[in-house]
A protein has these predicted regions:
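Non-heme di-metal
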Residues: 1-125
Length: 125
């Protein structure tokens, strides 16, 4: 089958709102965009753990510490699920992490702001 035929079938599925599965044929640019968006979301979940985790020992009460620990664990879980989703599209977790560490991949910039007070942490998280 020619690429033009595959693109037409793909676009027909999109137009009919048929779900595209990871193993389905899709244009390379579409696949790359999905991997970029999913990995950026995964990176944001994992990096988002950092300002929250920094406050676990300084939370104002035991109840808030427990809530914050659960939230940090939840963010980590979200990141792992998203990395797994991106892996189904044909990229490796190692490559996504390498791209993050090299600056090629991004994450939400809100996590670059300092969380100097408990209120700051709540606003960022």
């Amino acid at each position: 089958m020619q690429v033009q035929d595959l693109e037409k079938i793909f676009q027909d599925k999109i137009d009919q709102e048929i779900k595209i599965e990871p193993k389905d044929w899709m244009p390379d640019a579409y696949r790359k965009t999905n991997v970029r968006q999913i990995s950026q979301h995964a990176h944001s979940e994992v990096v988002g753990m950092l300002p929250e985790g920094n406050w676990i020992s300084r939370a104002p009460s035991l109840k808030r510490k427990a809530i914050l620990i659960a939230k940090v664990q939840d963010e980590g879980g979200h990141g792992l699920y998203l990395y797994s989703a991106a892996e189904t599209l044909g990229t490796s977790r190692e490559q996504m992490i390498d791209d993050l560490l090299s600056g090629k991949a991004k994450y939400s910039s809100i996590f670059n702001y300092p969380t100097l007070t408990w209120a700051d942490m709540g606003a960022v998280g």
